[in-house]
Amino acid sequence: MLVFKRGIHVVPKLPNSKALLQNGVPNILSSSGFKTVWFDYQRYLCDKLTLATAGQSLESYYPFHILLKTAGNPLQSNIFNLASSIHNNHLFVENILPSAVEHGTNSNAVVKTEPSRLFLSKIKDSFNGSDWEVVKEEMIYRAENEVLGQGWLFLVENNEKKLFILTSNNNGTPYYFPRNQSFDLNSAISIDEFATLKQMKELIGKSTKLNGKVQDWTMPIICVNLWDHAYLHDYGVGNRSKYVKNVLDNLNWSVVNNRIFSGISK
């Protein structure tokens, strides 16, 4: 039996797209801001990825699989950057969408969600007893100070099921640590950062010799888009920290809670 995969990359349809186009994402993005982030820029990226992979075996894969297949090949950096950006932006939009939009005149009303006990417990275990409010402040600080240009802010879960904060420059991915781009190599780096890069290089070399590939089980739990187009329309040049705070204060916890490993098969 022949199995056909899709050969073109398109922006996924959102169940409440009409309300989002009209009202935006409450407390985070205006209708125009959301239109830019999702309907305009995501479509632009999808069109570029379609052209970049046309006629190749990669064209039939989803962006997630494309970024994994191209992350280790410098000759495919263009394709990797497009696929990684598409996937990251999908993660971002997914975790800010309102849980539900009520029908009627007050279409801005949403169902409030809360972080699960498992999430809050993992936060305390992973950050030396700190609560979520403290971790949020740390995420805001690191977004402002570690990503000076374009990039992404993540809260991720590693292979030991511990949570940690990851900042990625440009189109870095949390799934493959040699390409998470947590350091901006276009500028000077500290001695500690150099030591980390050296350790990473040694680990990559060791892993490659053992089985020919690098294994990374890091999974993103929260994603914030730090690219200029995501916030400039609504927040202006000097208010990226306010934007990040609004995102972290208004997450769709139904989505975030489901991203955490619970150890229970569903």
UniProtKB/Swiss-Prot annotation:
Molecular-function annotations in GO: metal ion binding; structural constituent of ribosome; superoxide dismutase activity
Note: Present with 2060 molecules/cell in log phase SD medium.
Family designation: Belongs to the mitochondrion-specific ribosomal protein mS42 family.
Disulfide bond residue pairs: none
A GO BP entry: mitochondrial translation
Organism: Saccharomyces cerevisiae (strain ATCC 204508 / S288c)
Role summary: Component of the mitochondrial ribosome (mitoribosome), a dedicated translation machinery responsible for the synthesis of mitochondrial genome-encoded proteins, including at least some of the essential transmembrane subunits of the mitochondrial respiratory chain. The mitoribosomes are attached to the mitochondrial inner membrane and translation products are cotranslationally integrated into the membrane.
TM helices/strands, residue ranges: none
Coiled-coil regions, chain positions: none
Alphabetized UniProt keyword annotations: Mitochondrion, Ribonucleoprotein, Ribosomal protein
Quaternary organization: Component of the mitochondrial small ribosomal subunit (mt-SSU). Mature yeast 74S mitochondrial ribosomes consist of a small (37S) and a large (54S) subunit. The 37S small subunit contains a 15S ribosomal RNA (15S mt-rRNA) and 34 different proteins. The 54S large subunit contains a 21S rRNA (21S mt-rRNA) and 46 different proteins. mS42 forms a heterodimer with mS43, building a large protuberance adjacent to the mRNA channel exit in the mt-SSU body.
Subcellular location field: Mitochondrion
Protein name: Small ribosomal subunit protein mS42
Any single Gene Ontology cellular-component annotation: mitochondrial small ribosomal subunit
